[in-house]
């Protein structure tokens, strides 16, 4: 027994010595220096359970991203170190660090950490929860779906825009909660684009008869359970590796209802021949394109749930905050309306190409995504001992050694408020800041590197089309809430806590 103990102790000593030597070699080679440490403000933070105890409050008040931004300012750094129960997390808004971590050359040095644990009940091994060969396979399958020729199918949005306009006209001149309508529009168009048939939530809002072939109770349950799932998924993200603690029956029910909804459409395509798939009138639909590559039900379900999760809320968030800002900046609204009237005299003139050429519209969209990023932060976990290029030493410009298992969280919310990147008054909504010909490489609303969003053109095109059509139809927009800047909340994406209360006239 004594000999076994000595043998095991010897192995540990050798391992620790080798680990120490390797780390010292990295420190010497890259001239690494320690980062500034952010002190814990309470014993809950030190124990690492503040995010658990205050999870609901942080979600409702958007506390996490504003708390991070406040620490950057109080420490006067772009990268700081946080220690909780001996576990280290580096938090950065330095774009050089972010681009380094997300680059292709660093893919083997970083992994998704606890993200797969948080997402797996909902999207299984879909593209947002997979790594390595599984992720590469997902990306190869999905890339053709988001090719420009499919994104250009903008006329397929018009029926849902017509329903949106009808709802607004029913409340013309009255306060209207636009955030809800933005989510109804995007869930309708997303299900049409992904599955080939809309869930008709806008028609339900209007009290009109649905054209869906689905059972009414299943269709209604799908739309209502979607928001509940996202709220609970946010808490799972905050719990990290303890996400398994957040798995109540209500969460399981919400997920199952959404999978049952998607499975109806999967059942249909699994039974279709290759000829039927190729000749289908909606050949651009994601499900049909995936079914040409595989009939594996699990793969189809995981990828559909992944894209549905990402596609629906990103566009809804962008539309919500764009119209919120336009309602509080009448001079921007008036200028944008003039530009739209000049570029788009009628519905037929709205094409993928003309949308791209309307500069002021694109400036407004960029400024909205800068000020209100739909995903305000992201993170990676070191797969082995590695180095990030900046943030260490007294000058905060030296490299930092990151040990295996340590996490780096990067705040796009804070990056987008850096004056050295985006000019003065970065808390102000100012589309004209995008008029400079210099390309802002620091602006990465859809991430960067190999894992950059495949469908990043889609929310831009959707938001552009809806904005054009609404400004073609209505001549004025007023805010029905004086709260500015707004209270924001992070669910799957950033949202307005009190909704987007506006008046169209």
Swiss-Prot record:
It comes from Candida tropicalis (Yeast). The gene is CYP52C1. Keywords: Heme, Iron, Membrane, Metal-binding, Monooxygenase, Oxidoreductase, Transmembrane, Transmembrane helix. It is found in: Membrane. It is an enzyme of class 1 (oxidoreductase). Gene3D superfamilies: Cytochrome P450. Heme binds at residue 453. Induction: By various alkanes. GO terms for cellular component: membrane. It is a single-pass membrane protein. Belongs to the cytochrome P450 family. SUPFAM superfamilies: Cytochrome P450. GO terms for molecular function: heme binding; iron ion binding; oxidoreductase activity, acting on paired donors, with incorporation or reduction of molecular oxygen, reduced flavin or flavoprotein as one donor, and incorporation of one atom of oxygen. This is Cytochrome P450 52C1. Its EC number is 1.14.14.-. Its cofactor is heme.
């Amino acid at each position: 027994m004594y000999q076994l103990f000595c043998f095991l102790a010897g192995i540990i000593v050798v391992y620790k010595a080798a680990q120490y030597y390797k780390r010292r070699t990295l420190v010497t080679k890259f001239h690494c220096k320690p980062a500034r440490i952010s002190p814990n403000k309470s014993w809950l933070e030190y124990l690492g359970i503040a995010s658990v105890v205050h999870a609901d409050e942080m979600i409702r008040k958007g506390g996490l991203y504003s708390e991070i931004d406040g620490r950057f300012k109080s420490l006067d750094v772009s990268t700081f170190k946080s220690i909780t129960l001996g576990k280290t997390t580096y938090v950065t808004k330095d774009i050089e660090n972010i681009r380094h971590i997300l680059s292709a050359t660093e893919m083997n040095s970083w992994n998704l950490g606890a993200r797969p644990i948080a997402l797996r009940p909902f999207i299984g091994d879909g593209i947002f929860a997979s790594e390595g060969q599984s992720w590469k396979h997902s990306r190869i399958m999905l890339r053709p779906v988001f090719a420009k020729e499919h994104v250009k199918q903008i006329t397929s949005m018009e029926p849902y825009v017509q329903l949106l306009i009808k709802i607004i006209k029913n409340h013309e001149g009255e306060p209207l909660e636009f955030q809800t309508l933005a989510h109804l529009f995007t869930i309708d168009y997303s299900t049409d684009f992904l599955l080939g048939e809309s869930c008709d939530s806008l028609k339900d809002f209007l009290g009109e008869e649905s054209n869906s072939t689905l059972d009414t109770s299943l269709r209604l349950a799908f739309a209502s359970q979607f928001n509940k799932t996202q709220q609970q998924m946010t808490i799972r993200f905050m719990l990290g590796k303890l996400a398994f603690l957040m798995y109540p029956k209500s969460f399981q029910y919400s997920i199952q209802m959404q999978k049952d909804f998607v499975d109806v459409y999967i059942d249909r395509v699994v039974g279709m021949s290759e000829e039927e798939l190729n000749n289908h009138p909606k050949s651009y639909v994601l499900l049909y394109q995936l079914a040409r590559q595989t009939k594996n039900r699990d793969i189809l379900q995981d990828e559909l749930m992944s894209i549905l999760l990402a596609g629906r809320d990103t566009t809804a968030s962008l539309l919500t905050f764009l119209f919120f800002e336009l309602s509080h900046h009448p001079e921007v609204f008036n200028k944008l309306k003039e530009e739209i009237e000049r570029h788009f005299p009628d519905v037929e003139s709205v094409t993928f190409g003309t949308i791209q050429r309307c500069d002021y519209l694109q400036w407004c969209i960029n400024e909205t995504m800068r000020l209100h990023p739909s995903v305000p932060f992201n993170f990676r976990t070191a797969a082995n001992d590695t180095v990030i290029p900046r943030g260490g030493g007294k000058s905060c410009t030296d490299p930092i050694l990151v040990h295996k298992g340590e996490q780096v969280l990067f705040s796009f919310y804070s990056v987008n408020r850096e004056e050295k990147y985006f000019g003065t008054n970065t808390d102000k909504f100012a589309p004209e800041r995008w008029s400079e010909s210099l390309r802002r490489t620091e602006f990465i609303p859809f991430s960067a590197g190999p894992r950059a969003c495949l469908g990043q053109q889609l929310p831009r095109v959707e938001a552009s089309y809806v904005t054009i059509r609404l400004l073609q139809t209505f001549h004025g927009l007023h805010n029905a809430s004086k709260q500015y800047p707004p209270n924001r909340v992070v669910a799957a994406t950033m949202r307005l806590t009190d909704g987007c209360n506006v008046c169209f006239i």
